[in-house]
């Protein structure tokens, strides 16, 4: 009598034994394992590539929107700068600018609406909504109370607004990944557009507005001349930064070289004309105060327009 009678003597399932039983040899097993691992790696790589591609698309879209946002804010900056300067001339006694002031008043409303439009779409993404709302409300409040302020106080108040606008331009460049471009030529180009040009136009705008006001009010005192000269020196230093940036960009990006050559040629020509005019005032070569204030302002405007030649409407 068998001792295991009535008992199931069939051995339990064993993975390795089963493989031996079906005679799957080691090379085949290794090949199957390699195929399995390779499939997993390919799947992971595809997922990574797709994710990177999607991020690049989003980053590119954000950068394009950042450029649009910055261009519209730059146009607003120019508008506020011109209004600040001409309003100062009017408060100092130059009545001939009143018609242009009315035009600028309407223009500011349109420029604000243009920024509103792009901020509604991208303000949350760029974290700019709150800053822009503050700037917009500040402009509205100042336009209502500007006549109650002393001319110098009104000029300073508008300068506070332009400082906030320039900060917004930099912030948008940062949040839209414009200023983090790893390419050297692209970095210098974005740095020029985001940092140097806004500061340069603001220094030129302050010099234009304050000097024209001094001339209109016949107040070219030694102290005022000293302040104008200091502003001119700061503008000159920023001009040198602009020239260096253009040189680097052209050297590393031949595609942009010809366009930048045209731009910097016009900009430097505008700078020379403004500098010559400024020196004439400092030397007292122009004596017709009222005509001189408008002439000086117009030369300053031509300079700023040449500086902003990279911003396409």
What are these regions (language model features)?
Residues 2-313:
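Hydrophobic alpha-helical segments
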């Amino acid at each position: 009598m068998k001792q295991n009678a009535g008992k199931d003597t069939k051995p339990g399932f064993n993975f390795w034994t089963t493989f031996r039983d079906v005679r799957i040899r080691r090379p085949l097993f290794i090949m199957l394992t390699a195929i399995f691992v390779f499939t997993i790696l390919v799947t992971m790589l595809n997922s990574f590539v797709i994710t990177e591609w999607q991020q690049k698309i989003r980053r590119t879209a954000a950068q394009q929107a950042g450029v649009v946002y910055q261009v519209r804010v730059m146009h607003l900056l120019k508008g506020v700068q011109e209004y600040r300067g001409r309003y100062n001339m009017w408060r100092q006694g130059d009545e001939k600018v009143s018609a242009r002031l009315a035009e600028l008043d309407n223009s500011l409303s349109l420029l604000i609406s243009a920024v509103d439009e792009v901020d509604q779409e991208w303000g949350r993404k760029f974290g700019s909504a709150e800053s822009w709302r503050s700037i917009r409300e500040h402009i509205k409040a100042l336009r209502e109370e500007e006549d109650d302020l002393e001319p110098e106080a009104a000029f300073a108040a508008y300068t506070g607004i332009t400082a906030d606008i320039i900060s917004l331009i930099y912030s948008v460049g940062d949040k839209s990944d414009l200023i983090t471009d790893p390419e050297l030529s692209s970095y210098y180009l974005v740095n020029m557009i985001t940092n140097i040009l806004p500061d340069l136009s603001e220094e030129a705008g302050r010099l234009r507005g304050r000097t024209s006001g001094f001339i209109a009010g016949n107040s070219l005192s030694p102290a005022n001349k000293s302040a104008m000269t200091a502003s001119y020196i700061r503008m000159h230093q920023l001009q040198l930064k602009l020239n260096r940036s253009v040189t680097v960009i052209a050297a590393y990006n031949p595609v942009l070289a010809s366009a930048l050559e045209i731009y910097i040629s016009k900009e430097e020509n505008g700078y020379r004309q403004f500098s010559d005019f400024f020196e004439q005032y400092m030397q007292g070569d122009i004596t017709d105060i009222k005509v001189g204030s408008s002439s000086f302002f117009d030369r300053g405007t031509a300079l700023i327009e040449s500086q902003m030649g990279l911003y396409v409407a």
